[in-house]
Amino acid sequence: MKKALVIKFFMGNYLISDIETKDKITAQVKGKLKNYDTHKKELFIIKVGDIVIYENYLDRYLISEVLERHNELNRPNIANFNQVILVFSLYKPRFQFRLLDKFLLILNKYKLKIILIFTKIDLITKKKFLIIQKKISYYENFYRIYYVNSKNKNSTHHLMDIFSNKITVLAGQTGVGKSTFLNSLKPSLQLKTQEISKKLGLGKHTTKNAQLYEFNGGYIADTPGFSKLDLTIFDYEELKFFYPDFLLYSDKCYFKKDCSHIKEINCGVKKALKLSLIPDWRYDNYLKFIEKIQEQKKLNYNKK
């Protein structure tokens, strides 16, 4: 019995890398798969990043067990990573603070380390860049932020160290330049890139399945764009706990942890909002997310 890291899934097979030898092996699942979560009701699926037990049987390599995961995501299907790099374009597809906040909200729920990278800064005017950079700088209080010139391949070299000896998930809206960014880091990958749909202003999928690529002593996971960010994983009452900026002021709320930061009196978060310590758009997005969750929950209830 040996341990391996799942690198890729393709046509019912898994490309795995032996933990000790680093040999790449094509393996299949051996009958009923053993996994750490025996109480899980839904079908258990092997994910890229899983550590598995495999064996050699009649000249075939078979995966017999999946070891316990440290963390995982469902969109994309990936596990056991160290950090998430969110990639956003400042050109096309159009950058939206609401989408950024939505990503951050969901990833914060899973207590993941997040780094922000903004691409295509060379495709907008300097004036427009400075305006949007000023707003984005608010997030520097909580996350590391980098800007990338899509035409200058040397603009990514200073980012090499953040990948060192880590499994990094590269995520973001489709069409923002994730594959281009990866190619600039490691040209030998030669990942496919795509044109943006002129009609919709949205990206066309290039990456179809999550896959790990060896890089700088670790791995980079190029993932399919998040086609759907589902806020129904939240109860609207818990949303406030995943805003690190809200938490800075919530201890000053009269109702403490019970304050929703909406209609309550003596709310520390709303006071910070009035003092411009929290941006208007950030708070407005919070209200929109709560409204969306309540609407969806009500819709789901009526379907029963």
Curated annotation (Swiss-Prot):
Pfam families: RsgA_GTPase. Residues 70-229 form the CP-type G domain. One of its GO terms (molecular function) is GTP binding. Its cofactor is Zn(2+). The keyword Protein transport does not apply. GTP binds at residues 119-122, 172-180. The keyword Zinc applies. Keywords: Cytoplasm, GTP-binding, Hydrolase, Metal-binding, Nucleotide-binding, Ribosome biogenesis, RNA-binding, rRNA-binding, Zinc. Its EC number is 3.6.1.-. One of its GO terms (cellular component) is cytoplasm. InterPro entries: G_CP_dom (IPR030378), P-loop_NTPase (IPR027417), Ribosome_biogen_GTPase_RsgA (IPR004881), RsgA_GTPase_dom (IPR010914). It is an enzyme of class 3 (hydrolase). Binds 1 zinc ion per subunit. Zn(2+) binds at residues 253, 259, 261, 267. One of its GO terms (biological process) is ribosomal small subunit biogenesis. It is found in: Cytoplasm. Belongs to the TRAFAC class YlqF/YawG GTPase family. RsgA subfamily. One of several proteins that assist in the late maturation steps of the functional core of the 30S ribosomal subunit. Helps release RbfA from mature subunits. May play a role in the assembly of ribosomal proteins into the subunit. Circularly permuted GTPase that catalyzes slow GTP hydrolysis, GTPase activity is stimulated by the 30S ribosomal subunit. NCBIfam families: ribosome small subunit-dependent GTPase A. Monomer. Associates with 30S ribosomal subunit, binds 16S rRNA. This is Small ribosomal subunit biogenesis GTPase RsgA.
